[in-house]
Amino acid sequence: MKTKIRKAVIPAAGLGVRLLPATKAIPKEMLPLVNKPTIQYIVEEAVKSGIEQILVIVSSKKTAILDHFDYDLILENALIQKNKLQEHKEIEDIANLAHIFFVRQKNQDGLGDAILFAESFVGNEDFAVLLGDDVVFSKEPALKQCLEAYYETNCQTIGVQEVDPCHVDKYGIITPEGDYKNKDLIKVLAMTEKPKPKDAKSNLAILGRYVLKPSIFKALRSVPYGVGGELQLTDGLNFCLKNENFYARKFTGTRFDVGTKSGFIKANLFTALNNKDISKKEVLELLNLVKA
């Protein structure tokens, strides 16, 4: 019987440089898609995928994230007094989503360094990782799709999608075994962090969803700092590949990189179009203003 994945890690200590000056005082993870912070979408995806415990890795300037997932008795009591019962339930439900823990990453030395901060939380259990910049809208949560692949293979699994071959230098790219065009589950031979288009072995990009084993921690302590002078998770995964099988799950869904200006705006428009409180006519009027 395969062990259920109960724990997930969400790295959220980044500086949000691409969204400055908005992120000077506000964590980028707290910037909203319409009226809900982006990190709440990530947490909700984890919960819908069966995750019970979540560790969010933050920096010293990210206390707003802690506050968001905590109870706010003053606000809740005020809503009750004003008979705003629906709003009260919505606020209370946020604090009850899951068992959420926090740890500070003292220096932002890369994704691999952030993952190392989760070692004591994870213990000897296999676990999931969700990156906060990658918001995915799909009927079946992207992480759940990756977990299904993990349960099928009992191997470390990464979520991928095909990207424009001209843009592979923005992502971690996998080297697949054989033809991958008509497959959803693909064996991984290697991974390369932000390769030049001419050097990429595929256009399958690693897009912020992982199911990992505790062996990743030893691997990350065994590899040198890589691209950008940071400890890269991709390098740790390649170290594991020497002794373990890896699979990539080509997940379905509409994915946005909300850590970029264009991705953040597109995600807001997509969310608005699917929000019951906002008519499509209103969104189209906004687009017409832009055209004018």
From Swiss-Prot:
GO biological process: biosynthetic process; UDP-alpha-D-glucose metabolic process
Catalyzed reactions: alpha-D-glucose 1-phosphate + UTP + H(+) = UDP-alpha-D-glucose + diphosphate
Alphabetized Gene3D superfamilies for the sequence: Spore Coat Polysaccharide Biosynthesis Protein SpsA, Chain A (3.90.550.10)
Main enzyme class: transferase
Pfam families, sorted: NTP_transferase
Enzyme Commission code: 2.7.7.9
Example GO molecular function: UTP:glucose-1-phosphate uridylyltransferase activity
UniProt cross-references to InterPro entries, sorted A to Z: GalU_uridylyltTrfase_bac/arc, NTP_transferase_dom, Nucleotide-diphossugar_trans
Keywords for this protein: Nucleotidyltransferase, Transferase
Family: Belongs to the UDPGP type 2 family.
NCBIfam families referenced in this protein's UniProt entry, alphabetically: galU (TIGR01099)
Function: May play a role in stationary phase survival.
This protein's name: UTP--glucose-1-phosphate uridylyltransferase
Species of the source: Mycoplasma genitalium (strain ATCC 33530 / DSM 19775 / NCTC 10195 / G37)
Originating gene: galU
